[in-house]
Structure formats: structure tokens, C-alpha cells
């Protein structure tokens, strides 16, 4: 299981990304718009750089919601492969059965 501090750090980053999502989208639209003057685009670039680094969605990591495991996470369920198997085998996920061929 991942350390509690690492899990909390990821949750904090998710909250910050959500908070600045609209502002980042607005600035990026201004930067990528060719019809806007170069001065306005430059000022938008400076404002984007002034935002917190944790506001960038690139810094997020998909983690298991139960254990905090960073790898082997199925995004459809938000669970790591080990916990997904345990829960599926106990029949807690409707319609999920063990593969057999």
C-alpha cells in the first residue's frame, strides 16, 4: 500500500487541477488563437506560467482508490489489478466473471 502522504498529495493535486481547469483552458485558447495579437498571446503565456505547477493535469497519476497503487490500475473501475481481482472474485462487480476459453 502506498504511503498516506503520497495518496494525499495526489488528491491535493486533483483538487488544484479542478480549481484552475477553466482558467487554464481560457489561457490556452488565447495562446493558440492566431487571430489574437502577439502581445495578448504573450501576456496569456506569462499568466499561464504564473499558475501553480500542480494545476497542470500532466502531474496527475492514476491510482487505485483502495490501496493507492500507482501501476496496474484499471481506469474504468479506479482499482488496481489485485483489488479488482479480489472484488470481482467475491462477486461485488455486477456482470464481471472470470475469463474462460
UniProtKB/Swiss-Prot annotation:
Pfam families associated with the record: Ribosomal_S14
Keyword vocabulary terms for this entry: Ribonucleoprotein, Ribosomal protein, RNA-binding, rRNA-binding
Gene Ontology cellular component list: cytoplasm; small ribosomal subunit
Gene Ontology terms: biological process: translation
Highest rank taxon of the organism: Bacteria
Family annotation (InterPro entries): Ribosomal_uS14 (IPR001209), Ribosomal_uS14_bac/plastid (IPR023036)
Annotated GO MF terms: rRNA binding; structural constituent of ribosome
Intrachain disulfide bonds: none
HAMAP family membership: Ribosomal_uS14_1
Reported function: Binds 16S rRNA, required for the assembly of 30S particles and may also be responsible for determining the conformation of the 16S rRNA at the A site.
Family: Belongs to the universal ribosomal protein uS14 family.
Subunit structure: Part of the 30S ribosomal subunit. Contacts proteins S3 and S10.
Name the record gives this protein: Small ribosomal subunit protein uS14
Gene: rpsN
Amino acid at each position: 500500500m502506498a504511503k498516506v502522504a503520497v495518496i494525499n498529495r495526489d488528491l491535493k493535486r486533483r483538487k488544484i487541477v479542478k480549481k484552475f481547469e477553466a482558467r487554464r483552458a481560457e489561457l490556452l485558447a488565447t495562446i493558440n488563437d492566431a487571430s489574437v495579437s502577439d502581445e495578448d498571446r504573450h501576456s496569456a503565456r506569462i499568466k499561464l506560467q504564473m499558475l501553480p505547477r500542480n494545476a497542470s493535469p500532466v502531474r496527475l497519476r492514476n491510482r487505485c482508490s483502495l490501496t493507492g497503487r500507482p501501476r496496474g490500475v484499471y481506469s474504468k473501475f479506479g482499482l488496481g489489478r489485485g483489488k479488482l481481482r479480489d472484488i470481482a472474485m467475491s462477486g461485488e462487480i455486477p456482470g464481471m466473471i472470470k475469463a474462460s476459453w
